[in-house]
C-alpha cells in the first residue's frame, strides 16, 4: 500500500532536515521537499541534493525570485508598507509565496498534507497555517518543530543517530532569514535590547565607518508606482532590487534595530538589513508627494498602516488584503517619474524628483517674479475657513473667557510660589 505524501517547506538547515526523517518515523509519510529561491543567495543545488540524501522521496527547487518581486514585494512597496513604521516585512512577504507554491505542489502530487519548520513561538507559524487553510481548507498541516518540543541538543542527537548531516555553521549564534527584500537576524546577544548589535550580525550592509567617504547619487525610475530602471538602465524588478541592495548596502543604508510586537503576544528584538527596500520606499513616497492630490497623500498612510498589519499578521489571502490593495493600486495611476537619491554613510536622502504628472507648479509656489498665485483671494478663503471657529467662539464666549481666566489664575499662583 502506497504511503501518504506530505510536502515540506525545506531550507536545508538542521530543523527541516531532521523534519524529513521525523515525518517518516512519526506519520509514515513520503516526504516531498520543496525549496524556493526568493533571492537569498543559497546554493539550491546543494539544498536539493541534501533533501534526497536525508531521505526525501522527491526534492523540488523553484526559482521564485520574479514571482516574489512582482506579486508580493511590489504591492508592499506601492503601499510603503512598514510594520510599526520600521520593518519592511522582509520575512512575512515570502511566507505567502512559499505557502502558495507548497499547496500547488501538494495538489499536483496528490499529497494529503503540508509541513513547515516553524517553532511555536514565532509569527511565521501563523502565516503558514492561515495561508494553507485559506488556499486549501481540507489540507492537513504538520509543524514538526512545534510538535516535537526538543532542545537543540536533543535535535542534534536525533540527527546524529539517523545520519543526518549537521550544518557546519550550527554554532552560529544568530537565527537568520534572507530574501531579495532584505535580511533578518535575531537570537544570541541580540536578545538583550540594551546590547549593541555586533558587526557580525550584519552581512548586506557596511558599517558607517567602513562605508565610502564620498556620497553616491542614483536615479530610480518609477512607472505607476513600480521601479523600472536604475540609473537609466531598465531592469526586471527582482534584478533591480538585488542590484540596489549592493549599491545602497555599500553605503551602509538600511540597518534597522527594532523591538517589535509579535503577533503571538511577545516583544522581540530584531536586526534587519534592507538597503534596497529602505531606498525604494523612500524614493517612492517622495514621488507620491509630488504626484498625488493632498487628500490622497494624507489619507493613504492610514491604509498603508493597515496593509502592513495585515501582511504581518498572516492575512495575505483574505478579503481585507484584497480590498486594501485595490485602494493602493488606484492611487498609483500617476506615480510615474524619476527620483534622485544620495547615498552616504548610512543615509539615503532624496535630492531631486521629476514627473510629467507633477502637481507642483513653480508659478504658483514661487515668491519671485512670475508668481501667479492670487494673494487677494487668500483673505476670503481665510474668512470662510475660519468661520466655524469664529461661530463657536461667539456662541461659547463665556466658556472661553472662563478658561482664559483660569489659565491666568494658575500662572499667577505659580509666580506667587516662586516669589
Curated annotation (Swiss-Prot):
Record keyword Ribosomal protein present: no
Swiss-Prot/TrEMBL GO biological process terms: argininosuccinate metabolic process; L-arginine biosynthetic process; urea cycle
CDD domains found in the cross-reference section: ASS
Catalysed conversion reaction: L-citrulline + L-aspartate + ATP = 2-(N(omega)-L-arginino)succinate + AMP + diphosphate + H(+)
GO cellular component, one term: cytoplasm
Subcellular location as annotated: Cytoplasm
Domain of life: Bacteria
InterPro entries recorded: Arginosuc_syn_C (IPR048268), Arginosuc_syn_N (IPR048267), Arginosuc_synth (IPR001518), Arginosuc_synth_CS (IPR018223), Arginosuc_synth_type_1_subfam (IPR023434), AS_cat/multimer_dom_body (IPR024074), Rossmann-like_a/b/a_fold (IPR014729)
Binding sites annotated in the UniProt record for L-aspartate: 119, 123-124
Protein's recorded name: Argininosuccinate synthase
Organism: Brevibacillus brevis (strain 47 / JCM 6285 / NBRC 100599)
Gene field: argG
Amino acid at each position: 500500500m502506497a504511503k501518504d505524501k506530505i510536502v515540506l517547506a525545506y531550507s536545508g538547515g538542521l530543523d527541516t532536515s531532521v523534519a524529513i526523517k521525523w515525518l517518516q518515523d512519526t506519520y509514515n509519510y513520503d516526504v516531498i521537499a520543496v525549496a524556493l529561491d526568493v533571492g537569498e543567495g543559497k546554493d539550491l543545488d546543494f539544498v536539493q541534493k541534501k533533501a534526497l540524501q536525508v531521505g526525501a522521496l522527491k526534492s523540488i527547487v523553484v526559482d521564485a525570485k520574479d514571482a516574489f518581486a512582482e506579486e508580493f514585494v511590489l504591492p508592499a512597496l506601492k503601499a510603503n508598507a512598514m510594520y510599526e513604521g520600521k520593518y519592511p516585512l522582509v520575512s512575512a512577504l515570502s511566507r505567502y509565496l512559499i505557502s502558495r507554491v507548497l499547496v500547488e505542489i501538494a495538489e499536483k502530487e496528490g499529497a494529503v498534507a503540508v509541513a513547515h519548520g516553524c517553532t511555536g513561538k514565532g509569527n511565521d507559524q501563523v502565516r503558514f497555517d492561515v495561508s494553507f487553510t485559506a488556499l486549501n481548507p481540507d489540507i492537513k498541516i504538520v509543524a514538526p518543530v512545534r510538535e516535537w518540543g526538543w532542545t537543540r541538543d536533543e535535535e542534534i542527537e536525533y540527527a546524529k543517530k539517523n545520519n543526518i548531516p549537521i550544518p557546519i555553521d550550527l554554532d552560529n549564534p544568530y537565527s537568520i532569514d534572507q530574501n531579495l527584500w532584505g535580511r533578518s537576524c535575531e537570537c544570541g546577544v541580540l536578545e538583550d535590547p540594551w546590547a549593541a548589535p555586533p558587526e557580525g550580525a550584519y552581512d548586506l550592509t557596511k558599517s558607517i565607518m567602513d562605508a565610502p567617504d564620498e556620497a553616491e547619487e542614483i536615479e530610480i525610475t518609477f512607472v505607476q508606482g513600480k521601479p523600472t530602471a536604475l540609473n537609466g538602465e531598465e531592469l526586471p524588478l527582482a534584478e533591480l532590487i538585488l542590484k540596489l541592495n549592493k549599491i545602497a548596502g555599500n553605503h551602509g543604508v538600511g540597518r534597522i534595530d527594532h523591538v517589535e510586537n509579535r503577533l503571538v503576544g511577545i516583544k522581540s528584538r530584531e536586526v534587519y538589513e534592507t538597503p534596497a527596500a529602505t531606498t525604494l520606499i523612500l524614493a517612492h513616497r517622495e514621488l507620491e508627494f509630488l504626484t498625488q492630490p493632498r487628500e490622497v497623500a494624507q489619507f493613504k498612510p492610514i491604509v498603508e498602516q493597515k496593509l502592513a498589519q495585515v501582511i504581518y499578521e498572516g492575512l495575505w489571502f483574505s478579503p481585507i488584503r484584497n480590498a486594501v490593495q485595490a485602494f493602493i493600486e488606484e492611487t498609483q495611476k500617476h506615480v510615474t517619474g524619476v527620483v534622485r537619491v544620495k547615498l552616504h554613510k548610512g543615509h539615503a536622502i532624496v535630492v531631486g524628483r521629476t514627473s510629467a504628472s507633477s502637481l507642483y507648479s513653480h508659478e504658483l509656489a514661487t515668491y519671485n517674479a512670475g508668481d501667479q498665485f492670487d494673494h487677494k483671494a487668500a483673505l476670503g478663503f481665510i474668512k470662510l475657513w475660519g468661520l466655524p471657529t469664529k461661530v463657536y467662539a461667539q456662541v461659547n464666549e463665556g466658556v472661553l473667557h472662563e478658561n482664559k481666566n483660569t489659565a491666568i489664575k494658575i500662572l499667577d499662583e505659580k509666580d506667587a510660589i516662586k516669589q
